[in-house]
Amino acid sequence: MSKVSAKTIQVAVADLNGILRGKILPSKNAKKLKTKSIRLPLSALNVDLFGEDIENSPLVFESGDTDGYITPTERKPFKLTWLEKAPVFHPCWMFTDDDKSFLGDARHSLAKTLKGYREKGWTVTAATEMEFYLVNAQHGSLKPPINPKTNTQLVRADVLSTQDLNDFEDILNEIQEACIEAGINFESITSESGCGQFEVTLKHRNALLAADDALLFKVITKGVALKHRLTATFMAKPYLDQPGNGMHMHFSILDNEGQNIFSNDGDAGSNILKYAVGGCILAMKASTLIFAPFENSYERLTPKAHAPTGISWAYENRTAAIRIPMGNPLSKRIEHRVAGGDTNPYLVFTAVLGAALQGIEKKIDAPKPIQGDAYSLKLPRLAQNLSSAIDLFQNEDLIKQIFPKNLVTNLVLTKKQELKQFDKINSADKWKYYINSV
């Protein structure tokens, strides 16, 4: 990491949509980060996609729109290298004035879930596969990007093409360099199944830091793309005739000796793995709102479009919602494939790991793993639209065991307000509100 020095700093915390909210300060004021002096309204973490306060939010008029203070997380500050003045960014989270974690902050919600694992002497390691499109979003339309080497517009997908990687090497290399500056490490970069679509696999690490990595990767990728006069979008379904963007989450659990408790030296994995799968399966439908938080998200969850539609699990089968990859038994892990690229990683990790922990603690048996094409099977379905997803999330008892009560309330109010707002917008224009934000 480069030596951190700049004239300004940025401080920010993620709202419930995973959008950063914060301030720019002179660098001489960085010392305020250690004295609880940088304050934001608690309601800043509970605005809608349009940046508006939530009507009837308990965080606004009911409480007098109370402030909390933000303080740096355990991550080191880093330069936003793609910006001309390269300010130093300090990732933060929110606390209340009595020094308690503000559980309306999704990062605190995940930390609370991970505490349940630590109390058992376990550590969760996780990683994500981040899909995104590079697009040309100028002049009021959404088009594939211009190939920077040939100066012609892309007209087709070329999955796993090294030529695509070579042609877009400048932007991809700069994304990777900016990620290294931020302490984010890649496993690989590939071209994907959509025209102008790429996937970056991030390296496994402590689950809280892995969720940070996913969120910051999105920020970095969008920023670098704009520098190159392109838009990088994690919108779940930018083009109706192309595959959507997913955020696949992989995780394992290590005991206090560093041994993977999902492994039993065989291909099937341990009973604990199956209980974790059982919990994830049980909570999946009610958690659809977390995995598909916007109307556009449901365009991705369609058959034969590289995204799950039914609730299922399987060994080495990418049509299932949960996949258990084969390979070295000592590296046994769960891959949860439902979440779109438009999600808040902290909420996704909380939903998945909270459900897995419930499954382990209650010894919830997983159903029989499927074989073959999941799309051709009669399976229980995820919520089919945003409205039903909101209702399921709001009313399911298991959700209330996984997420803090005030976070559930705030998220439901947010999504109901967004649903009303999007109903007023012409369908042909809705993409404009997602493209740079989610």
Where are these regions (language model features)?
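Short glycine/proline-enriched loop/turn "hinge" motifs that connect secondary-structure elements
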Residues: 79-86, 124-125, 189-193, 241-242, ...
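Short, hydrophobic beta-strand segments
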Residues: 90-96, 198-204, 251
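Core alpha/beta catalytic barrel or barrel-like domain that forms the active/cofactor pocket
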Residues: 125-133, 145-162, 182-202, 232-249, ...
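Accessory "access/gating" subregions that flank catalytic or transport cores
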Residues: 163-168, 172-186, 200-207, 218-234, ...
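Active-site neighborhood of thiol-dependent amide/isopeptide-bond enzymes
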Residues: 204-216, 239-240
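Catalytic-core signal marking the mid-to-C-terminal active-site face
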Residues: 224, 230-231, 254-438
